[in-house]
A protein has these predicted regions:
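A charge-rich, low-complexity, intrinsically flexible signal that marks solvent-exposed coils, linkers
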Residues: 1-112
Length: 112
């Protein structure tokens, strides 16, 4: 099955343009997006394969428009909502509206 995430090697897309001296992250938000996504893996509610599937299941336009780490952020948001850790309203308002889910593992700073 080839989706938009399987573009590598397909005809008609042209070469991959490599930015000389490209930084690992183009902004602090990208660093945080990756960090939060990886840290949430400690919850035990998903693994690397499910996280990848969540990214690959996004609408195709999400892959071709916007920054790379926006894909990671949107997939994380979807996984958090699907597993009941946050609601869509909480995400939209940027604050908790319901009590935290009990029994979810939390990554502690000492574990990093």
């Amino acid at each position: 099955m080839n989706g938009l995430h399987d573009m590598g090697g397909q005809q008609g897309y042209g070469p991959v343009l490599i930015e000389a001296h490209e930084p690992l992250f183009h902004g602090e938000w990208e660093r945080r997006a990756l960090g939060v996504t990886v840290a949430m893996g400690a919850s035990g509610l998903w693994n690397i394969d499910l996280a990848r599937s969540a990214r690959e299941s996004l609408p195709p336009l999400d892959y071709v428009q916007g920054p790379y780490y926006a894909i990671w952020t949107k997939a994380l948001q979807n996984m958090l909502i699907e597993r009941g850790l946050i609601t869509a309203d909480e995400l939209a308002q940027g604050q908790p509206l319901t009590p935290p889910v009990a029994g979810v593992r939390v990554l502690q700073a000492a574990q990093v």
